[in-house]
């Protein structure tokens, strides 16, 4: 994760005056001509450009930017995040809030890296898999609540504000996520609480339904760090 050139991104000024004075580097017209992209369409025809991160901290580090200039805000976009995770199960999709590490808070974007690179992911996967195999909740996970097929846990092995969400469907994951976000403290001058979010899709072995083999069964997993 050593990339000295990343200081241009991580130390970028993100105050209102600085953002207005610079050209947005995520807008298509301001990107280098050699930077190509793939397209991804989210819900309600929201379109994204999938880009190689020019200042990576991971191998195969991606930026998934809206194809229009719109502020960084997770509202109404959680299902886009889960769809990205399901379509690309070998990646973890992550979101930095506008005041929580996003170097372009004026242009909405997710990021992605190969799943399993972060120790937190591996430990949470291990604990969830253990819980599902044994039927018992590990010490690291404290059950909080459920919404439909989605479950919320507090993760106790890191800082205090780490929550784990699991769900079988994108819709229930989004419902539970927004209920959790509604409980977080928020400053009056901010558009959303301060948090970072990881999301990935855990594929399950193919199952037979009405005699037909389906490989679509799996589980959405997310981690919110507040």
Q: Language-model segments: what does each one mean?
A:
Residues 109:
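Conserved, mostly hydrophobic/aromatic
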Residues 112:
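Phosphate-group recognition and catalysis centered on beta-loop-alpha active-site segments
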Residues 1-84, 91, 98, 103, ...:
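Active-site microenvironments that recognize anionic phosphate/pyrophosphate groups
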Residues 106:
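Histidine-centered nuclease catalytic patch
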């Amino acid at each position: 994760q050593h990339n000295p050139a990343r200081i241009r991104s991580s130390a970028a000024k993100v105050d209102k005056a600085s953002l207005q004075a610079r050209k947005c580097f995520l807008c298509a017209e301001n990107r280098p001509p050699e930077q190509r992209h793939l397209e991804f369409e989210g819900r309600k025809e929201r379109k994204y450009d999938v880009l190689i991160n020019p200042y990576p901290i991971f191998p195969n580090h991606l930026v998934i930017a809206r194809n229009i200039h719109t502020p960084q805000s997770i509202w109404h976009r959680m299902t886009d995040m889960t769809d990205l995770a399901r379509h690309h199960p070998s990646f973890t999709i992550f979101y930095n809030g506008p005041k929580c590490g996003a170097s372009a808070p004026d242009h909405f974007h997710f990021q992605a890296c190969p799943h399993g690179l972060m120790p937190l992911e591996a430990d949470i996967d291990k604990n969830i898999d253990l819980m599902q195999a044994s039927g018992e909740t590990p010490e690291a996970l404290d059950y909080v609540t459920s919404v439909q097929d989605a479950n919320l846990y507090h993760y106790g092995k890191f800082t205090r504000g780490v929550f784990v969400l699991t769900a079988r469907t994108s819709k229930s994951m989004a419902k539970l996520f927004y209920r959790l976000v509604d409980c977080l403290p928020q400053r009056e001058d901010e558009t959303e609480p301060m948090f970072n979010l990881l999301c990935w899709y855990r594929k399950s072995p193919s199952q037979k339904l009405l005699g037909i083999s389906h490989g679509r069964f799996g589980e959405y997993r997310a981690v919110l760090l507040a």
